[in-house]
């Protein structure tokens, strides 16, 4: 989406505006999704994921009384920095070696996530390396709990907006 908050021409992005929320609401109204996936990584030092998260949260809050939203689940995944604590994971999706490679190629399609991160924090690894290792560590946690061994796992936390959950 070409949201207005992002188009400042500067590293520091603008704040959330009504137009950002309206564009997002219009897309949700058009698609009437059963599932929405979003980056729930509030540790993102660049802050873009947090702004997008707040825009989507506000759009969903305003639309939650629509009938089609009764069947909509909002799933948050973590970015390159941290994983959800295992007790907060509501859905874990096993990834095969081919799916891990496909995810890496998808990361490469994002200009801001190629090569060395612009805002690496204390971690100089590339995004794909961080994501790969995070997904492998998640799979290892589940294996230690006695579940089948997988190459990697993507973990999601559900935002239960229908019940008024506050995050």
Where are the regions a protein language model picked out?
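Active-site beta-strand->loop->alpha-helix modules in alpha/beta enzyme cores, enriched
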Residues: 1-70, 105-111, 124-129, 137, ...
């Amino acid at each position: 989406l070409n949201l207005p908050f992002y188009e400042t021409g500067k590293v520091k992005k603008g704040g959330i505006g009504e137009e950002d929320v309206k564009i997002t609401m219009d897309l949700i109204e058009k698609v009437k999704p059963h599932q929405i996936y979003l980056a729930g990584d509030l540790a993102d030092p660049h802050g873009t994921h947090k702004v997008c998260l707040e825009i989507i949260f506000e759009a969903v809050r305003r639309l939650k009384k629509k009938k089609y939203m009764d069947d909509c689940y909002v799933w948050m995944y973590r970015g390159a920095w941290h994983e959800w604590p295992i007790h907060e994971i509501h859905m874990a999706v096993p990834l095969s070696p081919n799916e891990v490679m496909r995810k890496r190629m998808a990361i490469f399609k994002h200009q801001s996530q190629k090569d060395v991160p612009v805002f690496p924090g204390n971690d100089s690894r590339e995004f794909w390396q961080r994501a790969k290792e995070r997904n492998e560590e998640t799979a290892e946690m589940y294996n230690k709990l006695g579940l089948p061994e997988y190459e990697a796992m993507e973990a999601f936390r559900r935002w239960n907006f229908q019940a008024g959950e506050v995050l």
